[in-house]
Amino acid sequence: MDIQNIKETIAMIEEQNFDIRTITMGISLLDCIDADIDKAAEKIYQKIVKKAGKLVEVGNEIGHELGIKIVNKRVSVTPIAIIGAATAADDYTPLALAMDRAAKEIGIDFIGGYSALVQKGYQKGDEILIKSMPKALAATERVCASVNVGSTKTGINMTAVRDMGETIKIMSKGDKWLNAKLVVFANAVEDNPFMAGAFHGVGEADTIINVGVSGPGVVKRALEKVRGESFDILAETIKKTAFKITRIGQLVGQMASERLNVEFGIVDLSLAPTPAIGDSVARVLEEMGLETVGTHGTTAALAMLNDAVKKGGVMAAERVGGLSGAFIPVSEDEGMIAAVNSGALNIEKLEAMTCVCSVGLDMIAIPEETPASTIAAMIADEAAIGVINQKTTAVRIIPMGKEGEQIEFGGLFGVAPVMRVNKASSADFIARGGQIPAPIHSFKN
């Protein structure tokens, strides 16, 4: 084995903020369906505790053995709208409370799956879940929610987009954490290990382990060694680095699945930043030669980074999936925060960047007076990018405070500068409702 490779791997862990961001256990709740919501809630609690009871213990064991920090151990479950639909209840908060109770019992920080899939229309459970979302998220600490409002195959459910704009607006009047725990998707994936958008798809095995890695600091350090070189060498360097990062994720996932006696799912080939210095995707882009993220060339740099990470990672993992790409959450990336505060990065540029990377407008604070119709229109724009380009896009925005203020979240969530939003109205556009049809290139059968 190449001694230099061993040295580089040790440096990744000790000096460059490399970590496993999450081991997420996906759990099917289809066998917890019951006409009585209280019985369903108890079944949900019992199954999560039974299946994931040792998740934290095993995660800590593996981290200690390998000398790698495994930051989060999490759980995702079947979309609760499906489970709740079998009951006569008009509020699914009891199911959210059962999820929250189970999460606390097993010691995980978040549990995802208070979700609805409404890309082509509402069923009974979907409407009830969305209406109960503000209450359910306010009543729980660790439950995360998501709604899929569009897909390349079905188009965009604009009625759902309108409803989600209103839901986000309602939740903005409560705690700042409510909207930090809600993601609105187009082309949502069934095996996402990252919160807040994780849910366990109905096409998945009963219980699986998915792994998400994190390594922007590792990539930046590698690029520092090839300053001034051509893009060919830049891309090759990123690919080799991504291979090493993903290989460790694969090893951790295999070990976790064996010890928990659960099927191994996927490694998500994502670069996920944190607010820590040296763990920023924005700083990787700047290392490529940009004075600051947000300037002209940012989208091209991000496109190349995203593609090279996938090319390197796909060879290192048995199965890849999830969101797989570079994440650009504003509040969770110190380089992004600095770019927004300097005026170099705005929402319009972030929207352009989401065309070529993972997810979308993520952890962005906007002025609290922003109307629900404008929030819905932002969701519609992101959904359109995803639907037309056959990729996952999402919105996680926090209407709070006034433009220029800083919203403190702390921990992995960081600080969100309140960004300027276009004040021209989209109200008549959003009020139409209905469905934007699927694009012509989706018609492939």
UniProtKB/Swiss-Prot annotation:
Top-level lineage group: Bacteria
Cysteines paired by S-S bonds: none
Pfam hit, one: DUF711
Subunit structure as annotated in this protein's UniProt entry: Homodimer.
Family membership: Belongs to the UPF0210 family.
Name used for this protein in its record: UPF0210 protein YjhD
Lineage of the organism: Bacteria, Bacillati, Bacillota, Bacilli, Lactobacillales
Gene of this entry: yjhD
